[in-house]
A protein has these predicted regions:
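A charged, well-structured terminal subsegment
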Residues: 47-58, 134, 140
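Short low-complexity, flexible loop/linker segments enriched in glycine and/or proline
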Residues: 8, 31-33, 114-115
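Short beta-strand and adjoining strand-loop segment in the mid-core
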Residues: 26-47, 57, 71-79, 87-93
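General beta-strand structural signal in soluble alpha/beta enzymes
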Residues: 14-18, 57-60, 156
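Helical "substrate-binding/catalytic lid" subdomain
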Residues: 64-184
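Single conserved hydrophobic/aromatic residue that forms the stacking wall/gate
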Residues: 1-11
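Conserved catalytic-site region of short-chain dehydrogenase/reductase
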Residues: 23-26, 65
Length: 186
């Protein structure tokens, strides 16, 4: 038992988890955010390689990188749904999409969806941001499980996950995450 435990500790100390955020565009330019989990010695051995791909952010021990990636995508998904809901409502009040985007991005409601996705992928109706809806659901599902495990109250993560899963049922396979706006619009 002691030998097995020592072997597991040794293996654990040689691994890192390093998921990324930033999509294809930032991968091409080497500007990804790399969320690294693992011990400092192991991370320092691969730091130079990771820095070529983007900005290394140390999340914590082994596994923290993957937890951070899931939590990041949950926050992104919640912002996405809120932004889509607000844009849809603004249009019903006669607010032009471009005015909505400009005002939100100059105010406290600004987020990645309002800055990057609304005009380029939603208002244009291209819906091709390059991140599959099923992958967003996977990450939000993991985040929801993490939140459930650590806290007794998690109403928003449950609602975000349910909304994305329902959207996936309507939109089908190979849907881009920006297509969720189509569901909300109808």
């Amino acid at each position: 038992v002691v030998c097995r435990r020592q072997r597991q500790m040794c293996i654990r100390d040689r691994f890192i988890d390093a998921p990324v955020s930033g999509g294809v565009a930032r991968a091409i330019t080497g500007k990804l955010i790399i969320m690294v989990g693992g011990n400092e010695v192991t991370i320092s051995k691969v730091d130079k390689i990771l820095n070529v791909m983007g900005s290394v952010k140390r999340a914590g021990p082994l596994g923290a990188g993957h937890a951070m990636k899931s939590l990041n995508n949950y926050v992104s998904a919640a912002g996405l749904i809120a932004s889509f809901e607000a844009l849809n409502t603004a249009k019903k009040y006669g607010i032009e999409a471009r005015n909505f985007i400009e005002i939100i991005n100059g105010a406290t409601g600004k987020n990645n969806t309002t800055e990057v996705k609304l005009e380029k992928f939603v208002v244009s109706e291209k819906y091709n941001a390059g991140f599959a809806l099923d992958l967003m659901i996977k990450d939000v599902s993991i985040a929801h499980q993490l939140i459930q495990k650590m806290s007794s109250d998690n109403p928003l993560s449950k609602q975000v996950l349910a909304y994305l899963e329902n959207s996936y049922k309507i939109l089908g396979k190979n849907s881009d995450h920006t297509e969720v706006f189509k569901v909300l619009k109808n």
